[in-house]
A protein has these predicted regions:
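C-terminal nucleotide
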Residues: 2, 6-78, 89-128
Length: 128
């Protein structure tokens, strides 16, 4: 288990740099691929999507499974935040948004999806 954790952390550093590089060069598909790989590492190697003390309750695992099925290899989905009952972050292509939300809500309940949009420019400072 410790070997899996070390492997995940070392590779995660490279993935984070790769995500930044992909965004800088405008390669959103490469970014999504790295996000998906990072999420799979968290899920499979770190196993941080549910507490081992309550293995019968796995809402994040279920959300990732349902979301992955709906996405069908497009976009990306991963555990986000602290895991262990936290949240899932999904990058959903616009053409799949309604289908994705409907699929998630059918299993996890109405209102489980919060749709956010990423603006095309980064952070800004407003001087007053």
């Amino acid at each position: 288990r410790q070997m899996c954790i070390r492997d995940s952390f070392y590779r995660e550093d490279g993935r984070a740099q790769g995500e930044s590089d992909a965004l800088e060069r405008g390669d959103f598909e490469a970014f999504l691929h790295l996000v998906q790989n990072s999420g799979e590492s968290s899920y499979c190697l770190l196993q941080n999507v549910y507490p081992s003390s309550v293995p019968a309750e796995q809402p994040v695992s279920i959300a990732i499974a349902v979301g992955s099925a709906v996405l069908g290899g497009r976009g990306a989905i991963r555990v986000h935040g602290g895991g262990f009952g936290g949240t899932v972050q999904a990058f959903v292509p616009s053409v799949l948004l309604t289908q994705f939300r409907d699929g998630m809500e059918a299993v996890l309940g109405e209102g489980c999806c919060h749709v956010l949009q990423i603006r095309p420019i980064g952070g800004m400072t407003i001087l007053i």
